[in-house]
Curated annotation (Swiss-Prot):
Residues at the catalytic site: D126 (proton acceptor), R128 (nucleophile)
Protein name, entry field: GTP cyclohydrolase-2
Gene3D superfamilies for this protein: GTP cyclohydrolase II
Subunit relationships: Homodimer.
NCBIfam families to which the protein is assigned, alphabetical: PRK00393.1, ribA
Family: Belongs to the GTP cyclohydrolase II family.
Keywords for this protein: GTP-binding, Hydrolase, Metal-binding, Nucleotide-binding, Riboflavin biosynthesis, Zinc
Lineage per the UniProt record: Bacteria, Pseudomonadati, Pseudomonadota, Gammaproteobacteria, Enterobacterales
């Protein structure tokens, strides 16, 4: 295990009451959070989302991405299903950090796409490591997942890490004139499955 379960408390939201579970990475001390809705024990696959931290989209309502829209839609879908988990993965800006994300935004303002901007800053298109999320699922007792994602890479990495993904559930929300190029780039260059949005 790369992390430990540290604390938990109720978290009332507009979609209902979740249990917020805090985790800490053993090597770095970095914290991550799971939001659990309903009873996730048992043998039925759990509806789940691995959501990477996005301060600009999740908290500041940015229209540059679809992250905030996906966060809200995932919580709504989980609550409607009556049970599920959202892992809030603290890897801001596809794990380049907030300040580098702002630098990448500045490059995008100059005409670079999201992948080119990361490359200009010396990063891969996506620096995230989802293997930690498999440990979070395991610590929550979740083995089988219906994963809310448009990113096939998440499915592959979680499967390789021992989580049985029985279904990929599309989460296509939030397209607008400010993020069309960003979403088109994610589909064309990063393999995200965004048809229908």
């Amino acid at each position: 295990m790369q992390l430990k379960r540290v604390a938990e408390a109720k978290l009332p939201t507009p979609w209902g009451d979740f249990l917020m579970v805090g985790f800490e990475e053993l090597a770095t001390g970095q914290d991550h959070v799971a939001l659990v809705f309903g009873d996730i024990s048992g043998t039925e696959p759990v509806l789940a989302r691995v959501h990477s931290e996005c301060l600009t989209g999740d908290a500041l309502f940015s229209l540059r991405c679809d992250c905030g829209f996906q966060l809200e839609a995932a919580l709504s879908h989980i609550a409607e299903a009556g049970r599920g988990v959202l892992l809030y993965h603290r890897q801001e800006g596809r794990n380049i950090g907030l300040l580098n994300k702002i630098r990448a935004y500045a490059l995008q303002d100059q005409g670079y796409d999201t992948v080119e901007a990361n490359h200009q800053l010396g990063f891969a298109a996506d620096e995230r490591d989802f293997t930690l999320c498999a440990d979070m699922f395991k610590l929550l007792g979740v083995d089988e997942v219906r994963l809310l994602t448009n990113n096939p890479r998440k499915v592959e990495i979680l499967t390789e890490a021992g989580i049985n993904i029985v279904e990929r559930v599309p989460l296509i929300v939030g397209r607008n004139p400010k993020n069309e190029h960003y979403l088109d780039t994610k589909a064309a260059k990063m393999g995200h499955l965004l048809s229908g949005n």
